[in-house]
UniProtKB/Swiss-Prot annotation:
Pfam families: HrcA (PF01628). Negative regulator of class I heat shock genes (grpE-dnaK-dnaJ and groELS operons). Prevents heat-shock induction of these operons. GO terms for molecular function: DNA binding. Keywords: Repressor, Stress response, Transcription, Transcription regulation. GO terms for biological process: negative regulation of DNA-templated transcription. The keyword Transcription applies. This is Heat-inducible transcription repressor HrcA. Belongs to the HrcA family. It comes from Chlorobium luteolum (strain DSM 273 / BCRC 81028 / 2530) (Pelodictyon luteolum). HAMAP family: HrcA (MF_00081). It comes from the Bacteria.
Amino acid sequence: MGSRELNLRERQVLGIIIQLYVVTAAPVGSRYIARNYSLGLSDATIRNVMADLEAEGYISQPHTSAGRIPTDLGYRYYVDLIMKVQRIDEEEKRRMESDFGPISMEGRGTSAEVLVSAAKVLGSISRQLSVVLSPTLSNAVFEKLDMVLLSSTRMMVVLSIQSMFVKTIVMELQHELTRQKVDEVVDLLNERLSGLTLSEIRRSITRRLAGSSCDTNLKDLIVRSADSLFDESPIFERLYISGAEYIVEQPEFKQPERVRELITMIEDKFSVARLVEDIAPKQDLKRTAGHDVSISIGRENSALQAEDLTIVSAPYYAGSMVGTLGILGPKRMDYEHAVRVLNYMADCLTATLSDVN
């Protein structure tokens, strides 16, 4: 099924069916296409074209309708070979910049605030569920560290990483420490580790801290904890979600059971993060407007609960680090619009997070 390249008529009819279905959520009939589109084809000819498309698995007929709707295969052919992505229009561009700009201009706000803002703007503009994954930290460059004594036996370690990113971890102390001893270790760590990537620090911290006269107990604790301290945060802690109020308005989620299933999935942050991250390395990327945009449709998704959804994702950059933006919605999605706004938000995030390096 779907092994050959479609001819011009078939491509035109498939494109029209998908574009109409995206807007109306109603099956599309041959008579409507013949009357409203100047294809130079009769109703009977269009009906025959639709029969061929159905036979090859690109469209299907709901039991209660004479019209046709796209299948996963039809959507896949559309996004790979028919869809044309235009530049974002000026009105939408101004709206995104006005909503995202205040938190991002001139490096104002923390990295978390910037990513929360990006998720909100992306959800509002796309009218779908938006997901922002903060960058993985393996190649992140360590800038400085500080230690805050919470009590005589507890302290919080704050790592400042390139592009405004911060990681914190609370550590239990086996021995009481003075502020002076803590400051000596902080100075040592910043002097010997600043400018290294987190992966380099994990591999070489023992050697790099050797020969110092700082507090041995605290220094040894830092070395023993290096794999957690200078490592990735759990994936669900890197996730920012917005737009649930928009996706539940879609006709696909009118039934209460469907809404419950969707909300359950959204609340499982680990699963949502994995869904978006899992499609990023795929080889069948849709290359558009300078971005590697990955589109995973229906049963292409790794999770059973996402078989009725489409996930569109794109990378953004913060120095040497790479994060992921995503839009989740029903398969009946405006794909061209989703790719367009995702591309532009990726540009905005990359510019914002690069400006502070």
